[in-house]
Amino acid sequence: MKIKGNNVLITGGASGIGKIMGRMALEKGAKALIIWDVNQEALEATAAEFASRGRVYIYKVDITNSQLVAQTYQQIKDECGSVDILINCAGIVRGNKTFDQQTEQDIRLTFEVNTIAPMIITKEILPDMLRRNSGHICNIASAGGMLSTPKMSVYAASKWAAIGWSDSVRIELQEMKSNVHVTTIAPYFINTGMFNGVKSPLLPIQQPEPTARKIIRAIERNRTFRGIPFGFHFIRFWQAILPIRVFDFVFGTVFGIYHAMDNFTGRTK
């Protein structure tokens, strides 16, 4: 779907890759950029930075609060008009702990932000897209949603669920012959601060600018799925043909993915 002339809503859009995609959307002529984030200071700084690039609307939203999501979406419709492109980008990770060390609070929060919130937001916005028979939903999942990864089991589970939901909605819309499209993105670790401390001996940590560019391009081309880097498109193929122990050796030992989180620290603020 074209970015130019359309309203783009990005959750988690005041920092990291969400912020970069917002800038790119404005550069491509988005009618308005709508940013949801929980960090008021970052929202205001982003709005000031982007002010000369186009129309920017900022909203402080706790996306785990379904009532606030509904209220804010109504406010958007009153102030900005329709949401043509929704990018569910907000996410959290609680890593460097084995599952037995995870707290119930961390488990619930991870699923509320990474899995349930995109569903609630999409459920709020999708009916209007269906009525217009136009729109695009892009869900930022993770390569961790295709690979079992020690010390981030809860995060991986939340992203496995996100991928299953996102692609199922895509098929539902396809069978409805709707002109609303869904793109699922599964990137490897991205160097935005969210995964500080992660080590990847053979597979390169992805850089934010080219990653954001690939996501925007996937939206514009109505791609159904985009692994980043491209080789992650073949993960399921290798899982299907390799014995589990061989797969574990190749991806866990040779590529070092199973130990990527050993020194994880994440964002410090």
Residue ranges and their predicted role:
Residues 122, 158:
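Active-site helix of classical SDR
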Residues 142:
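Residue(s) in the substrate-gating loop at a strand-loop-helix junction
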Residues 97-99, 103-108:
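Substrate-binding pocket helix/loop in short-chain dehydrogenase/reductase
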Residues 40-41, 60-71, 104:
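The beta1-alpha1 cofactor-binding region of Rossmann-like NAD(H)/NADP(H)-dependent oxidoreductases
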Residues 30-46:
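Conserved glycine-rich Rossmann-like NAD(P)H-binding loop of the short-chain dehydrogenase/reductase
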Residues 2-34:
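Canonical Rossmann dinucleotide-binding motif of NAD(H)/NADP(H)-dependent dehydrogenases/reductases
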Residues 172-232:
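SDR active-site lid
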